[in-house]
Protein backbone atom coordinates (compact mmCIF):
# COMPACT_ATOMS: atom_id res chain seq x y z
CA UNK A 1 0.00 0.00 0.00
CA UNK A 2 1.17 3.52 -0.80
CA UNK A 3 2.29 5.56 2.21
CA UNK A 4 3.03 9.29 2.34
CA UNK A 5 5.09 11.14 4.95
CA UNK A 6 5.67 14.86 5.31
CA UNK A 7 9.35 15.79 5.30
CA UNK A 8 10.60 17.39 8.51
CA UNK A 9 14.03 18.56 9.60
CA UNK A 10 16.23 15.55 10.24
CA UNK A 11 16.44 12.09 8.66
CA UNK A 12 13.57 9.89 7.52
CA UNK A 13 14.31 6.48 6.07
CA UNK A 14 13.01 3.08 5.07
CA UNK A 15 15.03 -0.04 4.53
CA UNK A 16 15.58 -3.71 5.19
CA UNK A 17 18.25 -5.93 6.73
CA UNK A 18 16.21 -9.11 6.12
CA UNK A 19 18.21 -10.21 3.08
CA UNK A 20 15.40 -9.02 0.80
CA UNK A 21 13.21 -5.96 0.52
CA UNK A 22 10.52 -7.47 2.72
CA UNK A 23 6.75 -7.19 2.85
CA UNK A 24 6.68 -3.83 4.61
CA UNK A 25 9.00 -1.93 2.31
CA UNK A 26 9.95 -1.98 -1.34
CA UNK A 27 13.32 -0.55 -2.51
CA UNK A 28 11.50 2.51 -3.85
CA UNK A 29 11.00 6.04 -2.57
CA UNK A 30 9.93 9.35 -4.09
CA UNK A 31 10.05 13.02 -3.15
CA UNK A 32 6.81 14.69 -4.22
CA UNK A 33 5.20 18.10 -3.90
CA UNK A 34 2.32 18.07 -1.37
CA UNK A 35 -0.43 18.43 -3.99
CA UNK A 36 0.84 15.59 -6.19
CA UNK A 37 -1.74 13.13 -7.53
CA UNK A 38 -1.90 10.87 -10.59
CA UNK A 39 -1.86 13.75 -13.10
CA UNK A 40 -0.33 16.76 -11.34
CA UNK A 41 2.69 17.58 -9.24
CA UNK A 42 6.45 17.20 -9.13
CA UNK A 43 8.04 13.80 -8.49
CA UNK A 44 11.66 12.71 -7.97
CA UNK A 45 11.70 8.92 -7.59
CA UNK A 46 14.31 6.20 -7.07
CA UNK A 47 14.08 2.42 -7.40
CA UNK A 48 17.03 0.24 -6.35
CA UNK A 49 18.11 -2.41 -8.88
CA UNK A 50 19.01 -4.87 -6.14
CA UNK A 51 17.32 -7.68 -4.21
CA UNK A 52 19.06 -7.57 -0.83
CA UNK A 53 19.52 -5.25 2.14
CA UNK A 54 18.88 -1.60 1.28
CA UNK A 55 18.41 1.83 2.84
CA UNK A 56 16.61 4.81 1.33
CA UNK A 57 16.52 8.14 3.11
CA UNK A 58 15.70 11.82 2.87
CA UNK A 59 17.55 14.24 5.15
CA UNK A 60 16.40 17.84 5.58
CA UNK A 61 19.14 20.10 6.94
CA UNK A 62 18.88 23.32 8.93
CA UNK A 63 18.70 25.35 5.69
CA UNK A 64 15.75 23.25 4.43
CA UNK A 65 17.87 21.53 1.78
CA UNK A 66 16.93 17.89 1.18
CA UNK A 67 19.43 15.13 0.50
CA UNK A 68 17.87 12.02 -1.08
CA UNK A 69 19.84 8.76 -1.18
CA UNK A 70 19.50 5.02 -1.75
CA UNK A 71 21.94 2.12 -1.59
CA UNK A 72 23.08 -1.03 0.18
CA UNK A 73 22.16 -0.89 3.87
CA UNK A 74 25.31 -0.01 5.86
CA UNK A 75 24.31 -2.15 8.85
CA UNK A 76 26.77 -5.02 9.25
CA UNK A 77 28.21 -4.33 5.78
CA UNK A 78 31.84 -3.83 4.81
CA UNK A 79 33.86 -4.75 1.75
CA UNK A 80 37.61 -5.14 1.44
CA UNK A 81 38.98 -3.71 -1.82
CA UNK A 82 42.56 -4.80 -2.42
CA UNK A 83 45.02 -2.97 -4.71
CA UNK A 84 43.94 -3.42 -8.32
CA UNK A 85 40.39 -4.45 -7.37
CA UNK A 86 37.17 -2.47 -7.57
CA UNK A 87 33.75 -2.65 -5.96
CA UNK A 88 30.71 -2.09 -8.16
CA UNK A 89 27.71 -0.85 -6.21
CA UNK A 90 24.18 -1.68 -7.40
CA UNK A 91 22.49 0.98 -9.49
CA UNK A 92 19.36 2.99 -8.75
CA UNK A 93 16.88 4.08 -11.40
CA UNK A 94 16.01 7.77 -10.99
CA UNK A 95 12.86 9.21 -12.55
CA UNK A 96 11.58 12.79 -12.73
CA UNK A 97 7.98 13.66 -13.51
CA UNK A 98 6.40 17.09 -13.71
CA UNK A 99 3.01 15.52 -14.40
CA UNK A 100 2.30 13.54 -11.25
CA UNK A 101 2.61 9.91 -10.26
CA UNK A 102 0.96 8.62 -13.42
CA UNK A 103 3.72 10.01 -15.60
CA UNK A 104 6.33 8.57 -13.21
CA UNK A 105 4.72 5.13 -13.38
CA UNK A 106 4.63 5.14 -17.17
CA UNK A 107 8.34 5.99 -17.32
CA UNK A 108 9.20 3.13 -14.95
CA UNK A 109 6.93 0.71 -16.82
CA UNK A 110 8.37 1.52 -20.25
CA UNK A 111 11.95 1.37 -19.00
CA UNK A 112 11.48 -2.02 -17.36
CA UNK A 113 9.63 -3.51 -20.33
CA UNK A 114 12.16 -2.18 -22.84
CA UNK A 115 15.45 -2.55 -20.95
CA UNK A 116 15.16 -4.81 -17.90
CA UNK A 117 12.64 -7.65 -18.27
CA UNK A 118 13.94 -10.40 -20.61
CA UNK A 119 12.79 -9.51 -24.12
CA UNK A 120 11.09 -12.87 -24.67
CA UNK A 121 8.75 -12.13 -21.73
CA UNK A 122 8.55 -8.32 -21.83
CA UNK A 123 5.28 -8.28 -23.77
CA UNK A 124 4.22 -11.92 -23.72
CA UNK A 125 0.73 -12.50 -22.34
CA UNK A 126 0.94 -14.49 -19.12
CA UNK A 127 -0.87 -17.84 -18.81
CA UNK A 128 -3.97 -18.19 -16.66
CA UNK A 129 -2.84 -20.60 -13.96
CA UNK A 130 -4.21 -22.77 -11.19
CA UNK A 131 -1.87 -23.39 -8.25
CA UNK A 132 -2.44 -26.55 -6.20
CA UNK A 133 -1.56 -25.08 -2.79
CA UNK A 134 -4.89 -23.89 -1.36
CA UNK A 135 -6.68 -26.85 -2.95
CA UNK A 136 -4.38 -29.57 -1.60
CA UNK A 137 -1.60 -28.21 0.62
CA UNK A 138 0.62 -31.29 1.25
CA UNK A 139 -2.19 -33.83 0.88
CA UNK A 140 -2.37 -34.99 -2.72
CA UNK A 141 -2.01 -38.00 -5.03
CA UNK A 142 -1.66 -38.42 -8.77
CA UNK A 143 -5.32 -39.03 -9.59
CA UNK A 144 -6.40 -35.95 -7.66
CA UNK A 145 -3.78 -33.73 -9.31
CA UNK A 146 -4.67 -34.90 -12.81
CA UNK A 147 -8.37 -34.41 -12.08
CA UNK A 148 -7.76 -30.90 -10.71
CA UNK A 149 -5.67 -30.02 -13.76
CA UNK A 150 -8.46 -31.27 -16.01
CA UNK A 151 -11.04 -29.12 -14.23
CA UNK A 152 -8.71 -26.13 -14.51
CA UNK A 153 -8.33 -26.69 -18.25
CA UNK A 154 -12.09 -27.06 -18.64
CA UNK A 155 -12.74 -23.56 -17.26
CA UNK A 156 -9.98 -21.96 -19.34
CA UNK A 157 -6.79 -22.19 -17.30
CA UNK A 158 -3.62 -22.64 -19.34
CA UNK A 159 -1.11 -23.67 -16.67
CA UNK A 160 -1.29 -26.06 -13.71
CA UNK A 161 1.28 -25.45 -10.96
CA UNK A 162 2.20 -28.15 -8.45
CA UNK A 163 3.23 -26.35 -5.27
CA UNK A 164 5.05 -27.60 -2.15
CA UNK A 165 5.13 -31.29 -1.20
CA UNK A 166 6.27 -33.12 -4.36
CA UNK A 167 9.86 -33.94 -3.33
CA UNK A 168 11.84 -35.93 -0.76
CA UNK A 169 9.69 -37.06 2.19
CA UNK A 170 7.79 -33.79 2.28
CA UNK A 171 4.35 -34.14 3.90
CA UNK A 172 4.53 -31.04 6.12
CA UNK A 173 6.91 -28.12 6.68
CA UNK A 174 9.39 -30.07 8.82
CA UNK A 175 11.46 -31.96 6.25
CA UNK A 176 13.14 -32.36 2.87
CA UNK A 177 13.68 -28.81 1.58
CA UNK A 178 16.95 -29.08 -0.32
CA UNK A 179 16.35 -32.68 -1.41
CA UNK A 180 15.08 -31.89 -4.89
CA UNK A 181 14.18 -35.41 -5.98
CA UNK A 182 10.54 -36.25 -6.83
CA UNK A 183 8.65 -38.44 -4.36
CA UNK A 184 7.51 -41.05 -6.88
CA UNK A 185 5.39 -42.91 -4.35
CA UNK A 186 3.39 -39.76 -3.65
CA UNK A 187 3.27 -38.75 -7.32
CA UNK A 188 2.16 -42.22 -8.40
CA UNK A 189 5.11 -42.59 -10.76
CA UNK A 190 7.81 -40.42 -12.24
CA UNK A 191 7.51 -36.66 -12.61
CA UNK A 192 7.64 -36.87 -16.45
CA UNK A 193 4.74 -39.36 -16.33
CA UNK A 194 2.67 -37.00 -14.16
CA UNK A 195 3.41 -34.09 -16.48
CA UNK A 196 2.44 -36.16 -19.53
CA UNK A 197 -0.93 -37.04 -17.97
CA UNK A 198 -1.56 -33.41 -17.02
CA UNK A 199 -0.61 -32.14 -20.48
CA UNK A 200 -3.02 -34.70 -21.95
CA UNK A 201 -5.76 -32.64 -20.25
CA UNK A 202 -4.78 -29.67 -22.44
CA UNK A 203 -2.86 -27.68 -19.86
CA UNK A 204 0.84 -26.87 -19.32
CA UNK A 205 2.80 -27.69 -16.15
CA UNK A 206 4.73 -25.60 -13.62
CA UNK A 207 6.55 -26.48 -10.39
CA UNK A 208 7.37 -24.91 -7.00
CA UNK A 209 10.89 -24.77 -5.52
CA UNK A 210 12.50 -23.12 -2.51
CA UNK A 211 16.15 -23.46 -3.56
CA UNK A 212 17.75 -21.06 -1.05
CA UNK A 213 16.55 -22.95 2.04
CA UNK A 214 17.22 -26.31 3.69
CA UNK A 215 15.32 -28.40 6.26
CA UNK A 216 17.26 -29.74 9.27
CA UNK A 217 15.60 -33.08 8.46
CA UNK A 218 17.05 -33.46 4.97
CA UNK A 219 19.79 -35.42 3.28
CA UNK A 220 21.38 -32.14 2.19
CA UNK A 221 21.69 -30.78 5.74
CA UNK A 222 22.95 -34.08 7.10
CA UNK A 223 25.66 -34.09 4.42
CA UNK A 224 26.55 -30.38 4.65
CA UNK A 225 25.56 -28.71 7.94
CA UNK A 226 28.33 -26.17 7.27
CA UNK A 227 26.43 -24.84 4.23
CA UNK A 228 23.88 -22.84 6.24
CA UNK A 229 24.09 -19.24 7.43
CA UNK A 230 25.18 -19.45 11.07
CA UNK A 231 27.31 -17.84 13.74
CA UNK A 232 30.02 -20.37 14.52
CA UNK A 233 29.60 -21.85 17.99
CA UNK A 234 26.10 -20.42 18.50
CA UNK A 235 22.71 -22.10 18.38
CA UNK A 236 21.12 -22.11 14.95
CA UNK A 237 17.90 -20.11 14.65
CA UNK A 238 15.11 -21.77 12.69
CA UNK A 239 12.13 -20.14 10.98
CA UNK A 240 9.37 -22.04 9.19
CA UNK A 241 11.26 -25.21 10.11
CA UNK A 242 14.21 -24.32 7.86
CA UNK A 243 17.62 -22.69 7.64
CA UNK A 244 19.01 -20.36 4.97
CA UNK A 245 21.73 -21.75 2.72
CA UNK A 246 24.90 -19.66 2.50
CA UNK A 247 24.98 -18.53 -1.12
CA UNK A 248 28.21 -16.63 -0.51
CA UNK A 249 29.74 -20.12 -0.83
CA UNK A 250 30.20 -21.07 -4.53
CA UNK A 251 29.72 -24.77 -3.71
CA UNK A 252 26.21 -24.02 -2.45
CA UNK A 253 25.40 -22.13 -5.64
CA UNK A 254 26.75 -24.98 -7.75
CA UNK A 255 24.55 -27.45 -5.84
CA UNK A 256 21.43 -25.34 -6.47
CA UNK A 257 22.25 -25.00 -10.16
CA UNK A 258 22.83 -28.74 -10.51
CA UNK A 259 19.81 -29.93 -8.50
CA UNK A 260 17.26 -27.50 -9.96
CA UNK A 261 18.75 -27.82 -13.44
CA UNK A 262 18.48 -31.61 -13.25
CA UNK A 263 14.72 -31.39 -12.63
CA UNK A 264 14.11 -28.74 -15.30
CA UNK A 265 16.15 -30.69 -17.82
CA UNK A 266 14.36 -33.97 -17.17
CA UNK A 267 10.83 -33.00 -18.19
CA UNK A 268 8.64 -30.34 -19.79
CA UNK A 269 8.26 -27.59 -17.17
CA UNK A 270 7.25 -24.17 -18.51
CA UNK A 271 7.03 -22.22 -15.23
CA UNK A 272 8.88 -22.17 -11.91
CA UNK A 273 7.62 -20.58 -8.70
CA UNK A 274 10.85 -19.68 -6.85
CA UNK A 275 9.99 -19.20 -3.19
CA UNK A 276 11.90 -17.75 -0.22
CA UNK A 277 9.88 -18.25 2.96
CA UNK A 278 12.18 -16.86 5.63
CA UNK A 279 14.54 -13.97 6.21
CA UNK A 280 18.19 -13.80 7.23
CA UNK A 281 19.08 -14.14 10.92
CA UNK A 282 22.32 -14.80 12.81
CA UNK A 283 24.53 -13.86 9.88
CA UNK A 284 27.77 -15.79 9.66
CA UNK A 285 29.62 -17.84 7.06
CA UNK A 286 31.77 -20.90 7.49
CA UNK A 287 33.12 -20.23 4.01
CA UNK A 288 34.29 -16.62 4.41
CA UNK A 289 37.34 -15.71 6.47
CA UNK A 290 36.91 -13.78 9.73
CA UNK A 291 37.87 -10.46 8.10
CA UNK A 292 35.28 -10.95 5.31
CA UNK A 293 32.19 -11.82 7.37
CA UNK A 294 30.52 -8.46 6.72
CA UNK A 295 30.62 -9.17 2.99
CA UNK A 296 28.29 -12.14 3.40
CA UNK A 297 24.90 -10.54 2.69
CA UNK A 298 26.11 -8.91 -0.53
CA UNK A 299 28.05 -12.00 -1.61
CA UNK A 300 24.83 -13.97 -1.05
CA UNK A 301 23.07 -11.74 -3.58
CA UNK A 302 25.92 -12.06 -6.07
CA UNK A 303 25.70 -15.83 -5.65
CA UNK A 304 21.94 -15.81 -6.18
CA UNK A 305 22.30 -13.70 -9.32
CA UNK A 306 24.91 -16.18 -10.64
CA UNK A 307 22.49 -19.05 -9.99
CA UNK A 308 19.70 -17.23 -11.81
CA UNK A 309 21.96 -16.15 -14.68
CA UNK A 310 22.96 -19.78 -15.20
CA UNK A 311 19.49 -21.32 -14.94
CA UNK A 312 17.69 -18.71 -17.04
CA UNK A 313 20.43 -19.00 -19.65
CA UNK A 314 20.10 -22.78 -19.70
CA UNK A 315 16.27 -22.73 -19.71
CA UNK A 316 15.34 -19.47 -21.49
CA UNK A 317 11.73 -20.44 -22.20
CA UNK A 318 10.86 -21.20 -18.56
CA UNK A 319 8.86 -18.41 -16.91
CA UNK A 320 10.33 -17.87 -13.44
CA UNK A 321 8.14 -16.21 -10.81
CA UNK A 322 9.76 -14.57 -7.78
CA UNK A 323 8.01 -15.31 -4.50
CA UNK A 324 9.12 -14.60 -0.93
CA UNK A 325 6.30 -15.72 1.33
CA UNK A 326 4.27 -13.51 -1.00
CA UNK A 327 5.72 -10.24 -2.31
CA UNK A 328 8.70 -10.04 0.03
CA UNK A 329 11.24 -9.80 -2.81
CA UNK A 330 9.77 -7.66 -5.57
CA UNK A 331 12.43 -5.44 -7.12
CA UNK A 332 14.12 -4.63 -10.45
CA UNK A 333 17.02 -6.96 -9.65
CA UNK A 334 14.66 -9.93 -9.53
CA UNK A 335 12.71 -8.79 -12.59
CA UNK A 336 15.84 -9.08 -14.72
CA UNK A 337 15.78 -12.84 -14.11
CA UNK A 338 12.20 -13.52 -13.02
CA UNK A 339 9.75 -11.54 -15.15
CA UNK A 340 6.79 -12.39 -12.91
CA UNK A 341 6.33 -11.65 -9.19
CA UNK A 342 3.87 -13.17 -6.73
CA UNK A 343 2.63 -9.96 -5.09
CA UNK A 344 1.13 -11.46 -1.91
CA UNK A 345 -0.10 -14.66 -0.29
CA UNK A 346 -3.25 -12.66 0.51
CA UNK A 347 -5.53 -13.50 -2.41
CA UNK A 348 -8.69 -11.82 -1.10
CA UNK A 349 -10.01 -10.11 -4.22
CA UNK A 350 -10.72 -6.68 -2.70
CA UNK A 351 -7.49 -6.51 -0.71
CA UNK A 352 -5.55 -7.69 -3.74
CA UNK A 353 -6.89 -4.80 -5.83
CA UNK A 354 -5.23 -2.34 -3.44
CA UNK A 355 -1.97 -4.29 -3.54
CA UNK A 356 -1.96 -4.50 -7.32
CA UNK A 357 -2.62 -0.75 -7.55
CA UNK A 358 0.22 0.02 -5.15
CA UNK A 359 2.61 -2.28 -6.99
CA UNK A 360 1.68 -0.70 -10.33
CA UNK A 361 3.05 2.59 -9.06
CA UNK A 362 6.47 1.19 -10.07
CA UNK A 363 6.07 -2.15 -11.84
CA UNK A 364 4.12 -3.02 -15.02
CA UNK A 365 0.91 -4.98 -14.44
CA UNK A 366 2.35 -7.65 -16.77
CA UNK A 367 4.74 -8.82 -14.02
CA UNK A 368 2.14 -9.32 -11.27
CA UNK A 369 0.98 -12.87 -10.61
CA UNK A 370 -2.46 -13.21 -9.01
CA UNK A 371 -4.73 -16.14 -8.08
CA UNK A 372 -8.48 -16.42 -7.91
CA UNK A 373 -9.18 -18.20 -4.63
CA UNK A 374 -11.86 -19.15 -2.19
CA UNK A 375 -13.66 -16.49 -0.14
CA UNK A 376 -12.85 -15.97 2.66
CA UNK A 377 -9.21 -16.26 1.68
CA UNK A 378 -7.22 -18.99 3.46
Where are the language model's segments positioned?
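Residue-level preference for nonpolar/small residues embedded in alpha-helices
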Residues: 76, 144, 190, 303-304
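Composition- and surface-driven signal marking solvent-exposed, interaction-prone regions
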Residues: 104-109, 145, 334-336
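Glycan-recognition surfaces
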Residues: 215-254, 258, 298-378
